[in-house]
Amino acid sequence: MPNYRIHKTEYIDETKRVSFKYDGKTYFGYEGDTLASALLANGIHLVGRSFKYHRPRGIVSCGAEEPNAICQIGSKKDLTEPNVRATELELYEGLEASSQNCWPNVKFDIGGINNFISPLIPAGFYYKTFMWPKSFWKKVYEPLIRLSAGLGKSPTEPDPDIYDHK
């Protein structure tokens, strides 16, 4: 594991190693790390793609204001959480996270073609482009727009946890 840590801090306990998966690969961090700090310590800088043109994005801050490091947490269909900021998620053993808004992966994203055809898709083009025929909206246009939007995938199965309210 490459170690790109700058210095030791009182918040990260380097005696307690924690393993986690990001985009299917196993990495290691330490207790007290956030997902973002562990990714940077492992040399992972590309963590997402921009919404419209799918340009590469990296971690630019260390708090709740982070615009780029937005991840999908969990791999099961009933226990997954989209749109989690990597800068706010503390590492735990067995964490499974993946990047969002890219296909097939964050390094090679098919949506990156939008960057080359950007003159054809100015701001608000979808408000005028997808108006006709009206019957295409539900079956064709809306699913395509949703696929290209930078949102994570919500759980497809019911929540297996029990919440007892008294």
Where are these regions (language model features)?
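Ubiquitin-like/PB1-type beta-grasp interaction modules and other compact soluble beta-rich domains
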Residues: 1-23, 28-31, 42-80
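Short, structural beta-strand-to-alpha-helix junction motif
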Residues: 34-36
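Carbohydrate-associated surface elements
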Residues: 39
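Fe-S ferredoxin-like electron-transfer domains
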Residues: 51-166
